[in-house]
Amino acid sequence: MANDKLSEQSMDFAVQIINLVKQLKEQRESIISNQIGISGTSIGANIREAKYAHGTADFISKMQIALKEANETGYWLELLYKTNYIGKEQYNLLESKCKSMRAMLVSSINTAKNNSK
């Protein structure tokens, strides 16, 4: 059930990231927009892959990749904010959602590790 909520949140986040990429491309910013587009949409893709993992180790691996992508996305968001491509309100909204997913991913990974002992 928690993974369904995480899947839903990651899909909503990916949609917001794609909209951000469109906004950045209108501002003629392409390097960071490509990076955040990849990392921000990869979170949900890896969570979706984890749903059909070949066992606990594979599940944990996919969720750890999603966590790494979420951390990378947080970096790009901060960089966009600090270089004035996005405002404080947009940064706070997206970073809050990204942080929430990171917390859920850490929890899912820890639960899977504890259940595999």
Listing of model-derived features with the role each one plays in the protein:
Residues 1-117:
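Short, C-terminally biased terminal segments at protein or domain edges
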